[in-house]
A protein has these predicted regions:
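Eukaryotic beta-rich interaction modules
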Residues: 33-37, 64-69, 97-100
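A conserved hydrophobic helix/loop-capping motif in glycosyltransferases and polysaccharide synthases
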Residues: 83-91
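Short acidic, S/G/P-rich loop/turn micro-motifs used as interaction or catalytic elements
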Residues: 90-93, 153-155
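Conserved catalytic core of nucleotide-sugar-dependent glycosyltransferases
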Residues: 18, 123, 129, 136, ...
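Short boundary motifs at domain starts and secondary-structure transition points
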Residues: 70-78
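Cell-envelope/extracellular polymer assembly enzymes that use nucleotide-activated donors
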Residues: 80-83, 114, 217
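C-terminal catalytic/acceptor-binding lobe
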Residues: 2-46, 50-58, 207-210, 216-314
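Active-site-proximal specificity loops/subdomain of glycosyltransferases
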Residues: 92, 96-100, 107-143, 175-179
């Protein structure tokens, strides 16, 4: 194609070297149109990709959309299906890494799944717990358990269990394995639990605007609901079990504590959760990132500033 373009350029230069007439200009326009159409045809059609039998050794041709969907939800993998809920706002670089990585990881383990990116699009401070509540309510009847999963934490050990946690909540990113947080009551990062158990806790508190502390409150909810917490065993990779891709220098977390939030952060919210969650789904978008399907749920949270004035920074 590039050789053809050079020939066309030489023809055009020679063509213009003589006397310029309206017919020559018309002919030149036609040549340019034909060259443009040829370029468009080659760049937009599948002709520029390798045939199926000419892909490099070990590399399969791209999967079709139907293939991608079936690869995420193969009924032969078992009766349970995971809703991987990712609370999200503006971390697009991390998302581009996370979705293909997790889709491949779960496929390898034959975990039926769908990835839900709950994207906060309102003007309030980030509320991770409320977004996870939204993810639970919007996950559909085809899923029966949840993964509360941070977008910046990637599992590196194939022995980590993402299966159905029938006996109780399963903390994948346990304090013995998480690269940053090592206190005993930590339940953040990646936590699996059945929807039944999540409803028993009334979800997570909606009072935690800004970064942090919602996991500690949820730990107390698990205890109150009488649920036993399980963690991985036999994992020998220690703090190298996960790859933490958050760049603190580039994306600073909102850790400000304002008004009475400093006192509220250590209290248990006895009534809040799924039952008093207020939100609007602005739109749902089915996306494919490097061959991995996911659903983006653009969500506007609502805040009663009389109850939690710290949902905004003044």
């Amino acid at each position: 194609f590039f050789y053809t373009s050079r020939r066309a350029s030489a023809v055009i230069i020679g063509f213009l070297s003589g006397n310029c007439t309206i017919y020559k200009l018309f002919g030149l326009c036609m040549v340019l149109v034909l060259v443009s159409l040829l370029w468009l045809q080659l760049s937009c059609s599948g002709d520029m990709s390798l045939p199926a039998d000419r892909h490099p050794a070990g590399q399969q041709p791209p999967c079709t959309a139907d293939c991608q969907v079936s690869a995420a939800d193969d009924a032969s993998w078992g009766p349970h299906k995971l809703a991987l809920v990712v609370p999200f706002r503006e971390r697009f670089e991390e998302l581009l890494v996370f979705v293909p990585f997790m889709h491949t990881f779960l496929r390898k383990k034959k975990i039926r799944h769908k990835i839900l990116i709950v994207n906060q699009v309102d003007h309030y401070r980030f509320n991770r717990a409320s977004l996870i509540n939204v993810g639970c309510l919007e996950s559909g009847n085809d899923t029966d358990y949840l993964a509360m999963h941070d977008v910046d934490l990637l599992p590196l050990n194939d022995a980590l269990d993402y299966g159905f946690p029938a006996d109780g909540p399963f903390h994948v990113a346990s304090p013995e394995l998480h690269p940053l947080y090592h206190y005993k009551t930590y339940v953040g990062g990646i936590l699996l639990l059945t929807k039944k158990h999540y409803y028993m806790c009334n979800g997570m508190s909606n009072r935690f605007w800004g970064w942090g502390r919602e996991d500690d409150e949820f730990y107390r909810r698990l205890r109150k609901a009488g649920l036993q917490l399980f963690r991985p065993s036999g994992i020998t990779t220690g703090y190298k079990t996960f790859h933490h891709i958050h760049d603190a220098a580039w994306r600073k977390r909102d850790q400000k504590r304002v008004a009475s939030q400093k006192q509220e952060q250590f209290k248990v919210d006895p009534e809040g959760g799924l039952t008093n969650l207020h939100y609007q789904v602005e739109s749902r978008q089915e996306l494919t990132i490097s061959g991995a399907p996911c659903t983006v749920i653009n969500t506007k949270l609502e805040c009663d500033q009389n109850q939690t004035p710290w949902c905004v920074l003044t």
